[in-house]
């Protein structure tokens, strides 16, 4: 699956100087406006419908007619002609009327009384601490009816928080209307518009690059939207990203309940999307088990095997009660696959469908498993295997099912056997061809048996030998000198038949076991599971690549094995296992002092330098994280797990993919949201690694302060206040080996690496120079993810060891890893 130009690099939010700002001594009054530095947006007072009521709002500058994108006091307008927007004595942004009475406040609990308010070129109104430069409040976290590029909707179940859009009451009344747009917490999430407390329209589940209930989002659709969910921590973020053609654009929830994406082409506003589009799109239009056909007359039909619950109501056009099953299910799903009785339930496939509501995500890895899983579950009424999602199942009524003219998904509906086989006409056609088909099958079976016996007598396991011979020949032709080809029984013996006692760890691609060969050499065996997202081709490419990469800071591949369905990689064994065991364990972290940690940082950097610059192959790792750094007996680091790595050719500097793979928290913003990756993506991951090594804090779980800020925010605040010296792991504070200057410099370098804009990050050669010299370092910009408190967007910053993003169908725009290149 390939995403088309979706979600280009999110432009970082930044502070700007040298232009007017709102301060205690310089308030904004009626008739005066504040412009963003580039002149894209304007903040000021406006009157709606010439009513005399004044609102503080933000709009596109130099665009007519005026488009209001945010309103501060939408619930309480100012009726007088004298009002001021200013900074209060405690640092809040406040609106005062002519009597100095408080009309609106940004709220919060500011920690500084030395603040200013600025309008950024992104359209974000921010309150800035003059001392630290931190944002104390921002309008992007308090949306109205409009989303601008870089804004997001979110939910946070543990903290009972969510960010939504709320419509205006009318086109001229900014007060909250009756429609709310949000993302749902189910997995996968979907967009939902509510009218009051009732569902009004939904987008269908998110499938990685598109909403399944919006057929317009096909391969040609330029999609400015992106979503990341963290099922483990109960958070999700849906973002409106920056595209080349969407810089001047917005998403608006209208007073009528429509969600519109609109962009400006330089002369006119163009509607890019609108939903709901037809009456069929309204939620539950045809009731339970009803099917709303966009092109149908009447629009409502019953799904196959169902009939109207009330014929009279249905004929009169009242479809709300829906349909009921015509023939009861026999539900013999627990029978074996070979059992083919006349009463066995069957599935009827309906194409071009918007998946019904109340779906559940099942853990089956392919369509056949999804089919069989639903068949065995008597409560399963339907299933759909969706590209970009996987297996969706329904265990209750099918509601809000729509049939499109084109696009959509295939819904497999469970029916009684008689619903598909009770037609005499079908039986006649079947009987007419049955005899010929049986004869043909018998002939083919006889031929097959004869060939099988010949093969058995001539040479056993020829097909298996051919397969193994083919991949061995392929590898040998690629100049993989020194690579051993292991037999499966040797690896079974070495690992005690892959005993759980030998298990070292488990990831998205399979399980790693410790083993010992007959000569006493210890090894690590990565055994790919049958449901692994890494297929044979990717497995072969990984072998070809790693076998040609030789460096002291890269894990060495000793050999491989393919035996039937078994695919195994054999690596050198690292006695100290992975880095996370040391820096996050309360006892083992005492074994690595600052000198050792600094040596590990430098070793990882040297390994990256080899991958990015010094090797004859240019490789982007894409999954650099603490658990993928292994340690030998001398605590020297080795970069491991190249299952997601990509090879760059010639002057290629970046690539993009529709299937974002990697681990949240370590993924760069441009990669997590847009699928765009480069060497700078690895640099971002390296920066996160540095901060984890220095602090002993884990990106996935650490939070501090009343706002539950994440590790990047913690590092930024510490560096801003004292150069990051207090970031050192507290267990190292009393150690003589701690070099506070060196550690502070590493914090500085780490912050340079996690800057939001890829172009601002240093390359690995510059990082190595910074680590080995004392030259002055440039000032980093505040990381984007710092601007959201971690409890509100933890889905962007949490590493998911058991929930790594690893989509199987990755149609890459550049070549797969291929050592023959």
From Swiss-Prot:
Q: How does it sit in the membrane?
A: Single-pass type I membrane protein
For region Disordered, the annotated ranges are: 774-821
Superkingdom in the source lineage? Eukaryota
Q: Which residues form the Bulb-type lectin domain?
A: 21-140
> InterPro entries, per this entry?
Bulb-type_lectin_dom, Bulb-type_lectin_dom_sf, Kinase-like_dom_sf, Pan_app, Prot_kinase_dom, Protein_kinase_ATP_BS, S_locus_glycoprot_dom, Ser-Thr/Tyr_kinase_cat_dom
- Localization (cell): Cell membrane
Name this polypeptide is given: G-type lectin S-receptor-like serine/threonine-protein kinase At1g61360
Q: Which organism is it from?
A: Arabidopsis thaliana
């Amino acid at each position: 699956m390939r995403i088309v130009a979706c979600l280009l690099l999110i432009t970082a939010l930044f502070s700007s100087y040298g232009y007017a700002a709102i301060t205690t001594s310089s308030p904004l009054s009626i008739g005066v406006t504040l412009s963003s530095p580039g002149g894209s947006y304007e903040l000021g007072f406006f009157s709606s419908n010439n009513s005399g009521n004044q609102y503080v709002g933000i709009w596109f500058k130099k665009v007519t007619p005026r488009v209001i994108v945010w309103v501060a006091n939408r619930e309480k307008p100012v009726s007088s002609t004298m009002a001021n927007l200013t900074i209060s004595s405690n640092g809040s942004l406040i609106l005062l009327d002519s009597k100095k009475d408080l009309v609106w406040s940004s709220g919060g609990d500011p920690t500084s009384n030395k603040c200013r308010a600025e309008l950024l070129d992104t359209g974000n109104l921010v309150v800035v601490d003059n001392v630290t430069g931190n944002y104390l409040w921002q309008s992007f976290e308090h949306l109205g009816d409009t989303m601008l590029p870089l804004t997001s909707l979110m939910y946070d179940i543990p903290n009972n928080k969510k960010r939504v859009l709320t419509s205006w009451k009318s086109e001229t009344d900014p007060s909250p209307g009756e429609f709310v747009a949000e993302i749902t917490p189910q997995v996968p999430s979907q967009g939902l518009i509510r009218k009051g407390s009732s569902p009004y329209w939904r987008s269908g589940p998110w499938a990685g690059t598109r909403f399944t209930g919006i057929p317009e989002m096909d391969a040609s659709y330029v999609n400015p939207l992106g979503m990341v969910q963290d099922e483990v921590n109960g958070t999700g973020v849906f973002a409106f990203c920056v595209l080349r053609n969407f810089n001047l654009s917005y998403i608006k929830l209208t007073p009528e309940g429509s969600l519109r994406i609109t962009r400006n082409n330089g002369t006119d506003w163009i509607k890019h999307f609108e939903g709901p589009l037809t009456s069929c799109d309204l939620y539950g239009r045809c009731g339970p088990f009803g099917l709303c056909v966009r092109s149908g007359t009447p629009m409502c039909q019953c799904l196959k095997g169902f009939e109207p619950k009330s014929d009279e109501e249905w004929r009169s056009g009242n479809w709300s009660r829906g349909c009921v099953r015509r023939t009861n299910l026999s539900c013999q799903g627990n029978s074996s696959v070979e059992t083919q009785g006349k009463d066995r339930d069957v599935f009827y496939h309906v194409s071009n469908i918007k998946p019904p509501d109340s779906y559940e995500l099942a853990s089956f890895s392919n369509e056949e498993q999804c089919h069989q899983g639903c068949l065995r579950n008597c409560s399963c009424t339907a299933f759909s295997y969706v590209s970009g999602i996987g297996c969706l199942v329904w265990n209750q009524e099918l509601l809000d099912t729509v049939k499109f003219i084109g696009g959509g998904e295939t819904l497999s509906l469970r029916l009684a056997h008689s619903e598909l086989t009770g037609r005499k006409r079908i039986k006649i056609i079947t009987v007419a061809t049955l005899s010929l088909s049986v004869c043909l099958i018998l002939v083919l079976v006889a031929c097959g048996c004869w060939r099988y016996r010949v093969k058995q007598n001539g040479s056993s396991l020829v097909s298996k030998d051919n397969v193994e011979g083919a991949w061995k020949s392929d590898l040998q032709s690629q100049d993989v000198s020194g690579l051993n080809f292991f037999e499966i029984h040797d690896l079974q013996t070495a690992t005690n038949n892959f005993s759980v006692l030998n298990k070292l760890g488990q990831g998205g691609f399979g399980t790693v076991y410790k083993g010992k060969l007959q000569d006493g050499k210890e090894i690590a065996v990565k055994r790919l599971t049958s449901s692994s997202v890494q297929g044979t081709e990717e497995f072969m490419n990984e072998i070809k690549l790693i076998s040609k990469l030789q460096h002291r800071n890269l894990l060495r591949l000793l050999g491989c094995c393919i035996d039937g369905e078994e695919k195994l990689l054999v690596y050198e064994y690292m006695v100290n296992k992975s880095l996370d065991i040391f820096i996050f364990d309360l006892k083992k972290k005492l074994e690595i002092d600052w000198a050792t940690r600094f040596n590990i940082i430098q070793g990882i950097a040297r390994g990256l330098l080899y991958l990015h610059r010094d090797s004859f192959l240019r490789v982007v790792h894409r999954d650099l994280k603490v658990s993928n750094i292994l340690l030998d007996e001398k605590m020297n680091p080795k970069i491991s797990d190249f299952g997601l790595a990509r090879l760059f050719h010639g002057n290629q500097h970046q690539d993009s993919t529709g299937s974002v793979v990697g681990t949240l928290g370590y993924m760069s913003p441009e990669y997590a949201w847009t699928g765009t990756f480069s060497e700078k993506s690895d640099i971002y991951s390296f920066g996160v690694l540095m901060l984890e090594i220095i602090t002993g804090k884990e990106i996935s779980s650490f939070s501090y302060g009343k706002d539950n800020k994440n590790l990047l925010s913690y590092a930024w605040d510490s560096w801003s206040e004292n150069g990051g010296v207090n970031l050192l792991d507290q267990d190292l504070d009393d150690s003589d080996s701690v070099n506070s200057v060196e550690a502070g410099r590493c914090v500085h370098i780490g912050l340079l690496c996690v800057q939001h804009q890829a172009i601002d990050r240093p390359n690995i050669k510059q990082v190595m120079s910074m680590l080995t010299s004392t030259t002055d370092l440039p000032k980093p910009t505040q990381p984007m993810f710092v601007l959201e408190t971690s409890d509100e967007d933890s889905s962007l910053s949490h590493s998911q060891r058991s929930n790594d993003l690893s989509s199987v169908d990755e149609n890459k725009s550049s070549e797969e890893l291929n050592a023959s290149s």
